[in-house]
Amino acid sequence: MSQLTFIFAAMNAGKSTLLLQAAHNYVERGMAVELYTAALDTRAGLGVIRSRLGIERGASTFNADTVFDHRILERDTACLLIDESQFLRPVQVRQLHRLAHTSQVPIRCYGLRSDFLGHPFAGSAALLTLADEFEEVRAVCGCGKKATMNARLDATGARVSAGEQTLIGGNERYIAMCPRCFYLDSAGEQDAQSTAA
């Protein structure tokens, strides 16, 4: 039975690497795989999924207007892999859930669970609601513990606690942290207090 799977982690855990490895495994066995990534993430170029290890592969892009229905699938598609799935709209997650169950094509979405303030992305919240299976990828905090939170850094490397939810960046902009380090940091304390108020 095909299903919708959400593979999530904090920043820099290797989600894109895992997606690219999964794509390679299908292709190596002579199967067709379709890849999608968010159009707003152009760090590696438009329609390119690149891991921090340097491997990359071209992909179709999605934006807020993309409709995920049977028309996006090639006749022989064995699997649909979506990177940066936190940027999906909830209606798109519903479409993907429906597509997985009506097309018999497994759909695997890779993305962040929460933003730099610990708030859910709309796409991630919908995936946590509708996905049939979940896989958490382990990221490591600077203290060595499991990182589940993301902190945003400014140009000087200082942590910030305000700003737009979406600001595309990699290692220069974000750091994965365990919850303890996230909340002990002064910016995290300010956010926790403002959220509680």
UniProtKB/Swiss-Prot annotation:
Classification via HAMAP family: Thymidine_kinase
Entry protein name: Thymidine kinase
Documented EC number(s): 2.7.1.21
MF terms (GO), sorted A to Z: ATP binding; thymidine kinase activity; zinc ion binding
Similarity section: Belongs to the thymidine kinase family.
Presence of the UniProt keyword ATP-binding in the record: yes
PANTHER family (UniProt xref): THYMIDINE KINASE, THYMIDINE KINASE, CYTOSOLIC
InterPro entries: P-loop_NTPase (IPR027417), Thymidine_kinase (IPR001267)
Active-site feature positions: 84 (proton acceptor)
Enzyme class: transferase
Organism: Albidiferax ferrireducens (strain ATCC BAA-621 / DSM 15236 / T118) (Rhodoferax ferrireducens)
UniProt binding sites for Zn(2+): 141, 143, 178, 181
Location within or outside the cell: Cytoplasm
Gene3D superfamilies per UniProt: 3.30.60.20, P-loop containing nucleotide triphosphate hydrolases
Top-level taxon: Bacteria
GO biological process, one term: DNA biosynthetic process
Residues given in the record as ATP binding sites: 9-16, 83-86
SUPFAM superfamilies: Glucocorticoid receptor-like (DNA-binding domain), P-loop containing nucleoside triphosphate hydrolases
Catalytic reaction(s) noted: thymidine + ATP = dTMP + ADP + H(+)
GO cellular component: cytosol
Subunit structure comment from the entry: Homotetramer.
